[in-house]
């Protein structure tokens, strides 16, 4: 009987990209960070949930900081040095994700707020009464 061929695992190739864009999406429940090249191809990504935070802990600034540090480390492995940052969403992890990316050692050239603002479009969800 022939021996079954083991599945081949391809090692990630090391891309040599010097500058890129960090997309930080901070919602009320989670924070997602994707670092891409100038064309928009994802190089590295991370989120609060991917770092092991569950439930309401995902929406904390600390969880956003841990996720940003992880995505930043992955991007530095590909040779990335300078970043433009695009932040969108109303969540609490926006500022801490920015500081974490700066702490990893990136040279940040610009910060843009890409949060979509409606010109009185859809009806908003009902207000919370606590």
Swiss-Prot record:
GO terms for cellular component: ribonucleoprotein complex; ribosome. GO terms for molecular function: rRNA binding; structural constituent of ribosome. Keywords: Ribonucleoprotein, Ribosomal protein, RNA-binding, rRNA-binding. The keyword RNA-binding applies. It comes from the Bacteria. GO terms for biological process: translation. InterPro entries: Ribosomal_uS11, Ribosomal_uS11_bac-type, Ribosomal_uS11_CS, Ribosomal_uS11_sf. Pfam families: Ribosomal_S11. Part of the 30S ribosomal subunit. Interacts with proteins S7 and S18. Binds to IF-3. HAMAP family: Ribosomal_uS11. Located on the platform of the 30S subunit, it bridges several disparate RNA helices of the 16S rRNA. Forms part of the Shine-Dalgarno cleft in the 70S ribosome. Belongs to the universal ribosomal protein uS11 family. This is Small ribosomal subunit protein uS11.
């Amino acid at each position: 009987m022939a021996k079954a061929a083991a599945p081949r695992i391809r090692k990630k190739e090391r891309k040599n990209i010097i500058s890129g864009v960090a997309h930080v999406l901070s919602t009320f429940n989670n924070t997602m960070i994707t670092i891409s090249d100038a064309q928009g191809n994802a190089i590295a990504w991370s989120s609060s949930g991917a770092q092991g935070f569950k439930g309401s802990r995902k929406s904390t600034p600390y969880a956003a900081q841990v996720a940003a540090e992880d995505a930043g480390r992955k991007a530095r492995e590909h040779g990335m040095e300078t970043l433009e940052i695009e932040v969108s969403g109303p969540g609490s992890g926006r500022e801490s994700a920015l500081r974490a990316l700066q702490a990893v050692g990136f040279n940040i050239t610009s910060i843009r707020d890409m949060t979509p603002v409606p010109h009185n479009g859809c009806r908003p969800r009902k207000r919370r009464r606590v």
